[in-house]
Amino acid sequence: MDRVTRYPIFSNPRSARVTSLVLDEDTSYTVELVGVGPEAGWSQGDLQAWSTEYQTRPDVKRTNVSSNRRVFLGQQSPRSLYLEDEDEEIKSYHLDDSSDTLCRQRRELEAERWAVIQSQAVRKGGTVATLQAASDHGDLRIARQPQSTVTEEILVDTEQIDFLAARQQFLSLEKANTNPVPCGLTARETFPRTPPGINQAPKASTGPHLANGYTTAVTSPMKEVTLEKSFHVSPARSIHIVNDPGSQTQAESPETPKETPIEREIRLAQEREAELREQRGLGRAAGHQELVQIPSRPLLSKMSLTETPPRRDRGRPSLYVQRDMVQETQREEDHRREGLQVGRASTPDWPSQDPQPGLQRSLSSDCILSPDARATDPAPEARKVNRIPLDAYQPYLGPGTPKLEFSAFGVYSKPSGVSTEDTKATVFQKATESPRHVSESSGRSLSSKQEWSKPPGKATNVGVVRLGNFHLRPLRFKVPDVPQGTETPHTWGWEVAGGPILRLQKSQSSDLLEREMESVLRREREVAEERRNAFFPEVFSPVPAEDESHEQDSRSSSRASGITGSYSVSESPLFTPVHLNSGLVWKVEAPEDSAPPGQKTRKEMWYAGINPSDSVNSEVLGATRVKRHKNLLAERWEAHIYASEDEN
């Protein structure tokens, strides 16, 4: 009954009924058997399925069903029953002599309280599956041996709202909505059930079967039902309900776990997405492809004392930033590979060849581990690495140091038996035999690299760098001297010893974009040069034309050969420090009539992106500067005039 309006809420005779407490014969545990009537929304003419299990069980007492919550043993009921079917007879048979009623009362109240707590705690997770129950009439007759009987009145507390019945009714309605009955069945199939009770009887084989604290009956003699029709379960977990009561073990639940509405929405969305992907011919979205491997800092034992730690290890971004960067490069690679699969040779599918697809993208050429870190690993297939390869470092290594081979992992391995030059030469010959065009730039750079590199002498642990190696010849990645219109398409070429020859061609759009960027940058440099020469002819000496074209050639050709990396080139064509990742600054040999060193300091005196040597910028800066307005007293104070003559 509602506490405010005093209307009976669950006075429906078809609502949930609870039987009296039953005492097991062999033990002193109490067993509460609960029978539930048909739910409020179900029709009268529904077909009901009754369990015949109770007729065969000799150890349960005969009871009638009433809708009580509290049990008074050995007393008369202080109230009358409020049920509509008041002609119902209430009988109760005790098992053994009830001498100590007080202890039993206390035990029964504890048991009832424990049952309520258990039912709420287990039901809250939504993982326990119980069979939905039904009964048309009030009495569930259960055969049992005749014993000495004591009749007792059972009280219905009309002041309390039956929250348990309300919860069960709500759950049954929700189940009826979410799990519709298959259309082949005319009436609803109902299963007998004894919801939350306590079953601590040691004879688990004869008693009702336990499923996570629930006593459930598992047989339905009217109809054999398979639950595969109305549940989305895998065939390995589908459960058949058969007429053998011993077939259901205690571990199995008689029904698959219910699916919450949110889970159902997620599942439907995933199925929809999979169908759409199938229609569009896309592969299924695999979450494991997004798992990438991020290299951690090398241990102190891996680092040798002769080399400084790589620049990336000094100020390394956080793990999340690294993961995003690696994932982005991975997506770009996959996208490029998918686009290149039609008509051109593409990089092979990684999952079939290499079990670790994340390493190639995250390790780069400046992560210098010990040379034997990955010497045992097989050389991987080619990958684009956006760093300067080791060949760019070769002229600066002394002739006594061993030449390290560069693999696409970005990890240096020890030189193998075949010398680097031989492998490069064979790779280049194979590449020229392939039907694709190879740009002349890679050929020239290769030949120049082969001029620079000398056969490895005896390996020494001390890296000897000669002074002559610091005088850097201008980087000879020159584009061939052909007009812009007839330029051959840029190609990326990776030479990996023992790997397949793969040439990845740039797409036309990125090629055009790069050309446009180059022309814009070139025009900007020319304009800045003209401006400097116009305003400061005495500081900036005119540049020899051949050097300028040579410098621009080398810079654009390094872009053309795909070697774009973390090195910066200053804007002056005379004085070009190339910042490599080793922390040293390699400088191009300046011509004899080079600019005075004041130019470098002038370059470094930039503030807020404004070049102080640019007079146009300076004029704009001066025109937009706001004068600071001071009043007369402040100006006098700053001029150290603290007293006026008038006051004297």
Curated annotation (Swiss-Prot):
Which residues are recorded with the post-translational modification Phosphothreonine? T149, T190, T256, T347
UniProt feature, compositional bias: Polar residues: 349-367, 440-450, 557-568
Gene Ontology BP, a term: organelle localization
Which residues in this protein are found as Phosphoserine?
S77, S220, S253, S318, S352, S364, S365, S439, S507, S509, S541, S554, S644
What broad class describes the main subcellular location of this protein? other
Which residue windows does the record flag with biased composition (Basic and acidic residues)? 255-281, 325-339
> What protein name applies here?
Mitotic interactor and substrate of PLK1
Which species does this protein come from? Answer: Mus musculus (Mouse)
